[in-house]
Every structure is written in structure tokens, then in C-alpha cells.
Amino acid sequence: MYMKHFLILLLSFVLMSNVAFAQDSKEESKSKTVEFMAGCGSLMKKEFYDLPKVKGVVNQVLIITNVLTGKKVGCLSVETSYYNGRSSDSYIGTLDYEELDACVKSLTYIKDELLLSTPDVYTEVEYKTLDNLKLGAFYSKSRWTAFIYTKGYTSRSAEFLDSSNIATFIEVMNQAKSMIADKTK
């Protein structure tokens, strides 16, 4: 009798713990910069260079130097914030240097072609980085809305942009690309 109750209790615990751990499943980052930063047994120097803010999005170039080997990598760091009545959270996503060209092309397409169209159905486009940062736009209720999610697994990391913000974001990405190339020589 006790064994039956024990087994039921144990089975319930195992099932509940699986449900609890499945609630917030964050995707692992595949970013080369994030991977480089996580290196153990190395002394890392991180330098943050401010770029213009776009609406509520904070942009910085991050240059990471392995002091022991002299190797450097850089990325565009993008931060959004979420406020509820009691507290705030910040979410940071990255675009590796190698991703900036494709992202600029994607945003240019959204700005120059997509936002000028009027689809008959709900339409969405999205560019996703190795660090799970998402940029895109969707057409709903007869208008386009651009967005950025610094962490694709949570809507709390979202910032919605006006079409004019897209051009500014493209400029910021081009500045970041030039700065990273210059600082990682």
C-alpha cells in the first residue's frame, strides 16, 4: 500500500518537474561572439562603444579581446527593456560582424519594397540572427508594423518600430560594421 502511494507521488513529482522546466525554454545561442566570450581559461577584455539609440533600442558595438592571445571579435549589441508595474527587465541580443550585411539587405528590402506594398492577407517577414535576435515586419489591419525581438523566445524583448526607424537602424548597422572592422584589425 505504501509502495503504491510512494510510486504515485514519485511519478507526480517527475511529471511536474518536466512541466516546470519546459516553461521557459531558451534557445542556445550559436553566435560566434557569444561563443568567444564564453571561453574558459582566458582573460577577456570587453569594450563597449555607444551608437545612436533607435526608439527604445540601445545599440553598442562590443569588441572582445582575448588578452592572452590578442585575438579580437566584435558584434553589434542590441538592448530592449520591458517594464511592468513593479519591475523592469533588459534583453540583449547580438549580431555578429558576419551577419550585418545580410541584416542590412533584409531591412533595406523591408523599407524599400515591403512597406510600399499592400498584401491581401496577413503577411510577415523575419530575419533571425545566430543569437536568436529577430528583425522584421508584419502586415495586419491594413498597415505594416516593423519589430525587433532581442531574444526571440520572449515577447517581452520586443520593440515595435515606425518605418522611419528602419532607415536609422540601417545607418546604425553600417556604422557598427565599419567600427568593428576598424577595431578588430
Could you describe each region identified by the protein language model?
Residues 1-3:
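N-terminal secretory signal peptides that target proteins for export/translocation
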Residues 5-6, 24:
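Intrinsic disorder/low-complexity segments enriched in polar/small residues
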Residues 20-185:
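Positively charged, low-complexity terminal tracts
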Residues 6-16:
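Sec-dependent N-terminal signal peptides
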